[in-house]
């Protein structure tokens, strides 16, 4: 049991505080599930609604670029440039959430599957890893305030996410600055 876990053990919390903690954890879990569902449906409005404005993003493993601060709208345009032409499915597991009042941190394991039938190689690209996110309670509920995507490994055809596409280049530059 880590320090965060010990601080919120059932014996140390009154019933009302336990219910509040469980509610907050469920709301944060729901944010992550909407985040993934928005990606899978290519519902960029749903996806953007899971993020604070502005928020910090670290997608170094995908982009090779340093962390940046951006807006949900600009980030959703980047996600669309990466994924719009693909069939995708994001699965999350092993949720670990640490609450700190109106702030929270969480680690969420993911398997992200990407598929595009093509003539140039494998039709799939799968990423295995986790998100290390921070969250903030807002007037609209919990939202992601820091998004960090870490790959443990990948398999398949990484060129399905076409970083040479001018739309991808433009969207990446809007988030991270020029390459």
Please name every model-derived segment.
Residues 1-49, 53:
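Short, low-complexity N-terminal intrinsically disordered segments enriched in polar/charged residues
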Residues 2-16, 84-179:
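A beta-strand edge to alpha-helix "cap/lid" segment located at domain peripheries
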Residues 10, 17, 29, 60-61, ...:
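Generic, low-specificity signal for short hydrophobic/alpha-helical stretches with a mild N-terminal bias
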Residues 18, 22, 65, 69, ...:
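Charge-dense, low-complexity intrinsically disordered segments
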Residues 23-26, 79-83, 176:
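Generic secondary-structure transition motif, activating predominantly at the C-termini of alpha-helices
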Residues 44-112:
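A solvent-exposed, acidic/Ser-Thr-rich amphipathic alpha-helical stretch
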């Amino acid at each position: 049991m880590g320090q965060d876990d010990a601080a919120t053990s059932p014996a140390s919390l009154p019933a009302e505080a336990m219910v509040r903690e469980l509610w907050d954890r469920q709301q944060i879990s729901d944010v992550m599930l909407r985040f993934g569902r928005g990606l899978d449906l290519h519902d960029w409005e749903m996806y953007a609604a899971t993020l604070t404005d502005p928020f910090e993003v670290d997608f170094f493993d995908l982009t090779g670029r340093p962390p940046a601060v951006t807006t949900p709208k600009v980030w959703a345009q980047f996600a669309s440039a990466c994924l719009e032409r693909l069939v995708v499915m994001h699965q999350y597991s092993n949720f670990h959430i640490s609450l700190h009042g109106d702030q929270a941190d969480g680690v969420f394991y993911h398997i992200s599957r990407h598929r595009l039938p093509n003539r140039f190689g494998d039709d799939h690209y799968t990423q295995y890893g986790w998100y290390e996110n921070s969250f903030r309670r807002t007037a609209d509920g919990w939202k992601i305030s820091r998004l960090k995507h870490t790959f443990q490994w990948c398999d398949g055809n990484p060129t399905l996410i076409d970083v040479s596409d001018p739309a991808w280049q433009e969207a990446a530059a809007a988030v991270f600055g020029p390459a």
